[in-house]
UniProtKB/Swiss-Prot annotation:
This is Alkanesulfonate monooxygenase. It comes from Pseudomonas sp. Belongs to the SsuD family. It is an enzyme of class 1 (oxidoreductase). SUPFAM superfamilies: Bacterial luciferase-like. The lineage of its organism: Bacteria, Pseudomonadati, Pseudomonadota, Gammaproteobacteria, Pseudomonadales. One of its GO terms (biological process) is alkanesulfonate catabolic process. GO terms for molecular function: alkanesulfonate monooxygenase activity. It catalyses: an alkanesulfonate + FMNH2 + O2 = an aldehyde + FMN + sulfite + H2O + 2 H(+). InterPro entries: Alkanesulphonate_mOase_FMN-dep (IPR019911), Luciferase-like_dom (IPR011251), Luciferase-like_sf (IPR036661), SsuD_RutA_monooxygenase (IPR050172). Its EC number is 1.14.14.5. Changing D253E: In strain: Blue1.
């Protein structure tokens, strides 16, 4: 099975180490453009752009990078309760049209009550999912060209419609991640691809089975994806050393403050991430080659696959065998790690690459000329 491999735009900061400004770099437009263009050239199918008050706005970032990329798709956030579903549908169609069909959408209900209150959303966990279901029903129908009247508990629209259709028909695909039962119910009814954070394979298999069963009960099929960091090197020893370096500047106080902040979240997925390490930097390998060190101070995706290319590829295959066809990867720093993943991992997995433009001569990668007149060949050919 060919796998869709996405990269990540770190609009909330980037650097060589977690939890410190040492080794950090400015995430300005020029740097984001570097990462996006690298992902585009290396064969990643798309990039996830995060959302929230700690991030730059995902829609504006995507719009700014469309003109400087060729094939890369942009997975941007839909925020139910913060914007009207009809307005969001118009924005989605516009982004899809401006990008000539390179827009993808990620439904984000939110998990931080403090941040949501600051954005004017004062709904509890269950109410947010109720509102998200209503939002998505309207958004989908409007994008598909219907005139929509909807009288819901949280959202009411009358005569909602779209004049300029999206390029992708009947509409761009919708992605969504959530671990609660309410989230799984929403995924089963509304989305094309259900995302999970990188839990051990057995836990991921259980979630996939639950969503698949719920979708089948509604006569639907859902695809599956996973969000993971990757630390891949020439050898396993080098990869684990890189993992240790990534958290080498973290002290216990920083970890404790981060975990206290994340504890206020009502996100079930965030709670499951925190349970993998318990705020303790000992025994962070929670499953073979699955390392929970990132989650000591980072909200959201908190695990990384660690190893050499063949080892990480074997773990990717384990998840793929569960039914996952889309992998959203990242690594610190994101520019350099995009190259490492492409060069050390892509060799060992079946990557569904975007169509490449035709090139002539030696524009395709061939290495440096040997002794001025000898074309280098692959080690596998010798």
């Amino acid at each position: 099975m060919s796998l869709n491999i996405f990269w990540f735009l770190p609009t909330h900061g980037d650097g060589k180490y977690l939890g410190t400004s040492d080794g950090a770099r400015a995430v300005d437009h020029g740097y984001l453009q570097q990462i996006a263009q690298a992902a585009d050239r290396l064969g990643f199918g798309g990039v996830l752009i995060p959302t929230g008050r700690s991030c730059e706005d995902s829609w504006l970032v995507a719009a700014s990078l469309i003109p400087v990329t060729e094939r890369l798709k942009f997975l941007v956030a839909l925020r139910p309760g913060i914007i009207s579903p009809t307005v969001a549908a118009r924005q989605a169609a516009t982004l899809d049209r401006l990008s000539n069909g390179r827009a993808l959408f990620n439904l984000v209900t939110g998990g931080d009550p403090d941040e949501l209150a600051g954005d004017g959303l004062h709904l509890n966990h269950q109410e947010r999912y109720e509102a998200s279901v209503e939002f998505t029903r309207i958004w989908r129908k409007v994008l598909e060209g219907e005139n929509v009247d909807y009288d819901g508990k949280h959202i009411q629209v009358k005569g909602a419609k779209l004049l300029y259709p999206p390029v992708q028909q009947p509409r761009p695909p919708l992605y969504f991640g959530g671990s609660s039962e309410a989230a799984q119910d929403l995924a089963a009814e509304q989305v094309e691809l259900y995302l999970t954070w990188g839990e051990p394979p057995a836990a991921v298999a259980e979630k996939i089975a639950q969503v698949r069963e719920k979708a089948a009960a509604q006569g639907r099929e859902v695809r599956f994806g996973i969000r993971l960091h990757v630390i891949v090197r020439e050898t396993n020893e080098e990869a684990w050393a890189a993992a240790d370096r990534l958290i080498s500047h973290l002290d216990d106080d920083t970890i404790a403050r981060a975990q206290a902040s994340l504890a206020r979240f009502d996100s079930v997925g965030q709670q499951r991430m925190a349970a993998l390490h318990g705020g303790n930097r000992d025994n962070l390998e929670v499953s073979p080659n699955l390392w929970a060190g990132v989650g000591l101070v980072r909200g959201g995706a908190g695990t990384a696959l660690v190893g050499d290319g063949p080892t990480v590829a074997a773990r990717v295959k384990e998840y793929a065998d569960l039914g996952i066809d889309t992998f959203i990867f990242s690594g610190y720093p994101h520019l350099e790690e995009s190259y490492r993943v492409a060069e050390l991992l892509f060799l060992h997995i079946d990557v569904q690459r975007p169509e490449q433009p035709k090139t002539g001569g030696y524009v395709s990668p061939f290495g440096e000329m040997v002794a001025n007149d000898i074309l280098p060949k692959s080690v596998s050919q010798s």
